[in-house]
């Protein structure tokens, strides 16, 4: 029986552990260390919880220590791994305040990512910990369950009068949190160093639609501004950028995440951003040591190269692949496209692959084709929304490189999966134009927006 130690029980770790226990549990001894107090928190639902769009946090968990141990794993919670002896294959962790050593035959990292803290006067990070302390009260970041719980508890305390909130970071998490706070009746300003929201996921003509959507719901946008300082007498009172000052009562830092790979200790090859560099079997540069989820690289089918794309969906898939290979059952990942989506005040946006800007930066002779239309025929008077689509493709090979869609009709969310598969399988824009897409007035038009965008593509 092989002994496998898993460091981290986040989404990737949980997927990995469950896959091993469900399929190869009789063949392996599984030992898990995690520095957190809970398992499987769905951070993507955090804004819904904070904004009171769901009843509570209970449904945001799908596993726990007891469930994993019932299947046969040994799980140590609140037990950070301190060091790893790769030569002798020994993990040293802190368990109940004491040093604990665990030998292994195979090792899997599922250490996830840690929030990026930009250089801001007034904020101090505690090195080596996923938490941070600030020199001012009410400077928050949101990554873990307890982070969100702390924000909710503070907002629930009416004596604190936390009515004005600044969210720093205009990515998915920042935009979702801005909506959540506005839904609570707070005065919200969203600050980002770039001049648009959702930068990197969509081209600017699409991001402008989301920016207008936010402003239409009374969220102030302070884009193209760099945060310089957070000031106050014991508590947050104002946020200072390179262009203006905002009187606020709370600051949320949501500027992104970096891979948590401190345990590499100079022994494992890392990607340019510090992630564990892995092959298609999720194996690192040390044989028998694997990495899955946000701490590891992925193969990007749009770029045809190794990349870093931190998404829960990627975490689950890489966890499955890593589990099979660690257990001696060969399985290669098929790569990713970075498919993603967001829904803010009923405006739904989805994308996959590369934006036009990213495609050009990656060296492609890229161009785009697009189309705007109703989802259904004009005679369908109810629940018939406008849809905008953009398809990015390479002029030379004609291969589809990316797609973006936006609408108040949530049905577009399923369409992006087709484009994800198209990128994975190197489908051309010309083949897409003749792809068999069904028609029924309840769903779409005979010449629907996907077909029309492909048919009108530059030859």
Curated annotation (Swiss-Prot):
EC numbers: 1.6.3.4
Co-factor: note: Binds 1 FAD per subunit.
Active site: 11 (proton acceptor), 44 (redox-active)
One GO location term (cellular component): extracellular region
Cofactors named for this entry: FAD
InterPro entries per the UniProt record, alphabetical: FAD-bd_OxRdtase, FAD/NAD-bd_sf, FAD/NAD-binding_dom, FAD/NAD-linked_Rdtase_dimer_sf, Pyr_nucl-diS_OxRdtase_dimer
GO molecular function, one term: oxidoreductase activity
Sequence positions that bind FAD: 44, 110-113, 294, 312
Top enzyme category: oxidoreductase
Phenotype when the gene is knocked out: NADH oxidase activity was almost undetectable, regardless of the growth conditions. No significant difference in H(2)O(2) production. Dramatically inhibited growth under conditions of vigorous aeration in vitro, but no significant difference in growth under limited aeration conditions. Significantly reduces number of mutant strain 0100993 bacteria recovered from the lungs in a CBA/J mouse intranasal infection model. Significantly reduces number of mutant strain 0100993 bacteria recovered from the middle ear in a Mongolian gerbil otitis media infection model.
Residue numbers of Cysteine sulfinic acid (-SO2H) PTMs: 44
Binding site for NAD(+): 173, 192, 201, 256, 310, 341
Keyword tags: Cell wall, FAD, Flavoprotein, NAD, Oxidation, Oxidoreductase, Redox-active center, Secreted, Translocase
Localization of this protein: Secreted, Cell wall
Pfam families: Pyr_redox_2, Pyr_redox_dim
Highest taxon above the source species: Bacteria
Free-text function comment from the UniProt entry: Catalyzes the four-electron reduction of molecular oxygen to water. Plays a role in redox balance maintenance. May be involved in mediating bacterial adhesion to host cells. May be considered a potential virulence factor.
Recorded family membership: Belongs to the class-III pyridine nucleotide-disulfide oxidoreductase family.
PANTHER family cross-referenced by the UniProt entry: NAD(P)H SULFUR OXIDOREDUCTASE (COA-DEPENDENT), PYRIDINE NUCLEOTIDE-DISULFIDE OXIDOREDUCTASE DOMAIN-CONTAINING
Protein name, per record: NADH oxidase
Source species of the chain: Streptococcus pneumoniae
Gene assigned in the entry: nox
